[in-house]
Amino acid sequence: MVALVGVLPAMPAMAQNGAANGGANGAAAAGAVNLPPALQAAIQSGNPAAVSQAIATLSGGNSQRTAELATGVVAAAERILKTNPQAAVAIATVAVESVRTDAVSKGSPQQVTTVVTIAARIFVQPDVQRLAPEATANLASSAVQAASTTNNPTLVATIANQAVSAAEKVLAAAPAAAVQVATVAVQAVKEQPVTQGAPQQTLQVATTAARIIVNPEVQRLNPQAVASIAVATVQIASTPAVYQSSPQAAISVMDNSYKAASSQTVVAAAPTVVQTVTRELVQASQNGSLAQSNPTNSKEVSDILDRTNTVNRPPADQANNQNNQNNNNNNNNNNNNQNNNQPVVPPFTPAPTSPT
């Protein structure tokens, strides 16, 4: 448990705002200072469960009040980011979880936007990623899910992009958590309003996710998630609006996704994934809209399939040696068969000569 005593000093709201945030987040920072004493005490205890309970009790089930309190809590988390990054992540996660419901997002969409935006500023920090990689990944996943409730395509794509970028940064330390973030982010941007409303950021999410799933450790830990991401990222990259934002980046997504799907580890867990991804790639190679954005699209997509198939085939020398061995075996078998089929000739025995 992380002690937070003294993180909310008693000072005038405007002075606190200016010192901590330079005036950039006035409302959020002021809300952090004006938190009810019970909530301040919960934050200072360093107990995330106590913070969550305090929000629930003080809001009384009122979604707007929940959003207000969560905004203040996440602002308090950002305040202590430099001095206590681990505590900042824990507190911010509670705030984000509080606004993940549809009732809160519909009643207070602007405050939900503020909460997830501040949360993203926390989980992209290198110190947070280094000291608390799994907690950082969990915060990133929650922020994407909360953003998705707002039905704001730009917000969803922005938070998802930041989240999957953070996931890639913590990949070595927390591969299982990283692939979970990638799963959530890809599913969030796969929806049509997002692919159409924020195609460039959507493609960036797919690009980063595809890089994550080629990692062998990720494939070992969660091959089924890798298979799911591989299919989804190919579908995203082959969406005309997304593809045309950067055809070469889209081709790279397809390439990495197919490599991941073709991994023996992934195929063992999801036997149909190669067939599914192949079908998506074939459709992409025949898509006229993609060809308009990139005249060499068909060839480039076909090359992905050819390269992967070549990798899966034995080397030419090995194949030739195998063929030669097979031919030798066949020749030996034929010789044996011919020998077996020769008529048996009895040994020559000279006739006895008559005595004269």
Task: List where the protein language model places each region.
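Sec/Tat signal peptide C-region and signal peptidase I cleavage site
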Residues: P9-A15
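Cleavable N-terminal signal peptides
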Residues: V2-A3, A13
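Short, low-complexity polar/charged micro-motifs in intrinsically disordered terminal tails
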Residues: G6, A351-P352
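Non-catalytic all-alpha helical scaffold/repeat segments
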Residues: Q16-N334, Q338-P343, P347-F348
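Short, solvent-exposed mixed-charge patches
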Residues: N17, T353-T356
